[in-house]
Amino acid sequence: MQELIKRTLPQDDALNQAIVNELRSQNWAGFLNYSQVQQLCHNFELTPLKLAMHLLPLAASYSHTAISHFNVGAIAIGEQGDFYFGANQEFANSAIQQTIHAEQSAISHAWLRNERRISDMVVNYTPCGHCRQFMNELHGAEKISIHLPHSQNNPLHSYLPDAFGPKDLDIAAHLLAEENHDLVADHQDDLVNQAILAANQSHCPYSNSPHGIAILFKNGDVVTGRYAENAAFNPSLPALQTALNFAYLNDKKLSDIERIVMAEKALKLSHKTMAETLLSTLTSVELEYYSL
């Protein structure tokens, strides 16, 4: 990742050098907190939006696009000014529905870092309909601004007029809000407990079938993922995808996976088979499944 980032950001530029130094200090995690953003903006006389635009090729470098070879980068800006990178993640030898879009990537990245509200989405290509619908699930969706290289300060709902969303199904819950499904993490295995805790934070008001993923890497690091459901159903994002996406954006190698645990309360639907199918194309490590 280090060399890819350096190729993306030519190191004969002082701003690029400063960005690389920030990323190096955090092991190449695709994230800049508010303080880092403000320092870069101050040092190089930039607005946060101009900095985000400059960072789009960098965000896109986190993509995995074995199918399309079309890299999309996105940056979700949290309400306190943190920058969450996102990139499209494709999975060869699996169903195309397993794909993670760049805006989904950035939002789920923010969610797993416990962001509660997105104010702006900066992306290098116009959001597709799938992503517009996914963003409409967010708390405060009507206030989100979309920024493209050729057009800034566009309300999300200008891309999604007469929008269908949670309110049409009498659902008050929104993605990124605090969730609690009363799932108890009392297993003897800590990795199972982490999967249960992730499931407990799922956003699944339509099926009430939460599930979570916990991935243990060989160095002892653990990455978790939560299920993000959508009013339109198909733009929903399973927990395995949110976990894999977070791993990619934090420079984790799937070859270093040691264990993968899934905890699920399958009331109306289950993601077990879908997760096993995708994992079989990525790793020889088998899914450990726990029914809640």
UniProtKB/Swiss-Prot annotation:
The entry's keywords: Hydrolase, Metal-binding, Zinc
SUPFAM superfamilies the UniProt entry points to: Cytidine deaminase-like (SSF53927)
Signal peptide: none
GO cellular component: cytosol
Cofactor: Zn(2+)
Catalytic activity as recorded in UniProt: cytidine + H2O + H(+) = uridine + NH4(+); 2'-deoxycytidine + H2O + H(+) = 2'-deoxyuridine + NH4(+)
Family matches, as Pfam families: dCMP_cyt_deam_1 (PF00383), dCMP_cyt_deam_2 (PF08211)
Residues binding Zn(2+): 101, 128, 131
Cofactor note: Binds 1 zinc ion.
Disulphides: none
InterPro entries linked: APOBEC/CMP_deaminase_Zn-bd, CMP_dCMP_dom, Cyd/dCyd_deaminase_Zn-bd, Cyt/Deoxycyt_deaminase, Cyt_deam_dimer, Cytidine_deaminase-like, Cytidine_deaminase_bacteria
GO terms under biological process: cytidine deamination
Annotated EC: 3.5.4.5
Residue ranges of domain CMP/dCMP-type deaminase in the record: 47-167, 186-292
GO-annotated molecular function: cytidine deaminase activity; identical protein binding; zinc ion binding
Active site per UniProt: 103
Quaternary state and interactors: Homodimer.
Family classification: Belongs to the cytidine and deoxycytidylate deaminase family.
NCBIfam families in the cross-refs: cyt_deam_dimer, PRK09027.1
Name assigned to this protein: Cytidine deaminase
Taxonomic source organism: Haemophilus influenzae (strain 86-028NP)
Gene name per UniProt: cdd
